[in-house]
Amino acid sequence: DALPIFAIGGNIGYDWFAQWGTNEALGADYAVGALTWNNYYAWIMAANNVIKQIDASDFATLDATQKSYLGFAYAYRAMFYLDLVRLYEFKENNYTEAPGVLGLGVPIVLPETTEAEAKNNPRAKVDDIYDQVIFPDLDKAEELLSGSTAPDKYTISPALVYGLKARAWLKTS
């Protein structure tokens, strides 16, 4: 009478975000906590690879396709760092003291970062991440994408860049 499809079982892969909700398997001994970090830095690497491949020394020499790809890469990288800073910045609170990490965000990895540098790349100050990566990337994306229109809601547009700038300014002002 009891077919296996009717049996009540444990976790079969559905709702794997529940681990965050129940605060299970998030310690240093589990891979779940590293998923977000690893995904974001893989996406940053992809953006860095595009930035590295397109000569951005003079935007005027780029054709429309190169400008849009480079603009997308800068916008995505800024968005990824904006998310990472908000996720990993230690916030002052009444429950935990952590003076050693107050004001620190995440490591900055740029196209020119070597493998040796990446192996010993400490967390950067939050202000430095905004000043060295987020705002400059958004300014470049705005310049490269100015006058363009997105063909659909899935493509980065100047409006999205302005929205990211607004979020960044809200955080820093």
Residue ranges of each PLM-predicted region?
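Extracytoplasmic ligand-binding clamshell segments of periplasmic binding protein
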Residues: A150-P158
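Aromatic-residue-lined binding/catalytic grooves and analogous aromatic/hydrophobic interfacial grooves
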Residues: A159, A168-S173
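Short, contiguous alpha-helical
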Residues: R86, K165, W169
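Conserved, well-structured interaction surfaces
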Residues: G13-E89, A124-D127, E142-P151
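Short coil/linker segments at helix-helix boundaries
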Residues: L87-Q132
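TPR/Sel1-like alpha-solenoid repeat signature
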Residues: Y74, Y162-K165
